[in-house]
Amino acid sequence: MDSPSLLEVLQVQQVEKLISPSLRFILAYFTHRYPRFLLRAYNSFDGIYLLVKLLLEKSQLKKWNATSVERRFQLKRVIAVRDSSIIAEEFPQESESATSLNGIDVLKKLFLTYCIPYLLEKCESLTTVKENHTAVSILSLQARDKQKGALSVFYSKIKILLVRLKKILHFVFRLIRKSNTYLQWLYYLLYALGKTPYTNLADHILRQRVIYNVENIHSRKLISTREKSSLLTSIADHSMEGFLIIIQLIDWWQSNNYESHLKKGEVAFTELAPPKLPFEINVSTTDICKICGEKIKNPAVLSTGFVFCYPCIQVWLQRHPFKCPVTNLELSRKGESFWRLMI
């Protein structure tokens, strides 16, 4: 099983993190125009988003063994099994059924990935609200103790304990969030070094890993016929896919700052004569990777215009920096020499 690179994993997580702020911004824009109808929905955005996200991702995981963003990047989830590649070659059907997610795996994935972060965020926000008033509350309660009887003193002490408990809980939640951030970077490092097949703690607990969905790449017609089985599911899938494409385009445009380049008249193109190829191109070789010699999987295009397997061109550029494997020409845009094709 071919695992995606760390760059692809980070890209998936980046797009995943952009969904909620983008939807919140859109809702805030329309709430400003129609507050009477949308203000209540905007105030309850986190809960509504979690509910819709759970319903959508549950159907995606059951149907495709992947979340909506992972499916967009042609990835899928499998249960980690020892010597899975050897078992897949000898017993392909048994291996596929053994590594596919069942209903319990889907529910555990949803709970760890979406519900727990939501609960931690809400608990931290609830304790943060009272944190600024902690000192004032304790002093005011202690002042009232001197003026009231024993029963009121008892209640005041309980309130003081609750205020201090909230302060401790707020510190604990912040510590958990920071520890999770450091642990996430540790998983990134181990994954990049090939020491673990998991990209985060939740996947490690669930024993789920992410791999390329080769079947999804080479069987578009089968997918399109399966999607027509449910009209509502099909509409949700296509709407989500279109929304993700828009998010990626906006993020790509802003991160590359193309607007300022266009205003300044800066052009990143290099005028080169057509290269002389060392082989004759025909119909039978157009879908063959020029590096591994096999049919192209997970296509990626180089700045010279040739298409290769995404893992192949990554390894090639690490061994031969800024050189095209076909033309042997130096790449003009060394910072962004190749792009993955989403077809």
From Swiss-Prot:
Biological processes annotated in GO: protein import into peroxisome matrix; protein import into peroxisome matrix, receptor recycling; protein monoubiquitination
Origin: domain of life: Eukaryota
Record: residues binding Zn(2+): 289, 292, 309, 312
Pathway: Protein modification; protein ubiquitination
GO CC annotation, single: peroxisomal importomer complex
Keyword Ribosomal protein attributed: no
Transmembrane segments: 6-33, 38-62, 103-140, 147-193, 239-266
Keywords: Membrane, Metal-binding, Peroxisome, Protein transport, Transmembrane, Transmembrane helix, Transport, Ubl conjugation pathway, Zinc, Zinc-finger
Subcellular locations according to the entry: Peroxisome membrane
SUPFAM superfamilies: RING/U-box
GO MF term set: ubiquitin protein ligase activity; ubiquitin-protein transferase activity; zinc ion binding
Residue ranges covered by zinc fingers (RING-type): 289-328
Peroxisomal matrix side: 1-5, 63-102, 194-238
Membrane topology: Multi-pass membrane protein
Residues in compartment: Cytoplasmic: 34-37, 141-146, 267-343
Record family assignment: Belongs to the pex2/pex10/pex12 family.
Free-text note regarding domains: The three subunits of the retrotranslocation channel (PEX2, PEX10 and PEX12) coassemble in the membrane into a channel with an open 10 Angstrom pore. The RING-type zinc-fingers that catalyze PEX5 receptor ubiquitination are positioned above the pore on the cytosolic side of the complex.
Its job: Component of a retrotranslocation channel required for peroxisome organization by mediating export of the PEX5 receptor from peroxisomes to the cytosol, thereby promoting PEX5 recycling. The retrotranslocation channel is composed of PEX2, PEX10 and PEX12; each subunit contributing transmembrane segments that coassemble into an open channel that specifically allows the passage of PEX5 through the peroxisomal membrane. PEX12 also regulates PEX5 recycling by activating the E3 ubiquitin-protein ligase activity of PEX10.
Subunit comment: Component of the PEX2-PEX10-PEX12 retrotranslocation channel, composed of PEX2, PEX10 and PEX12.
Name of the protein in its database record: Peroxisome assembly protein 12
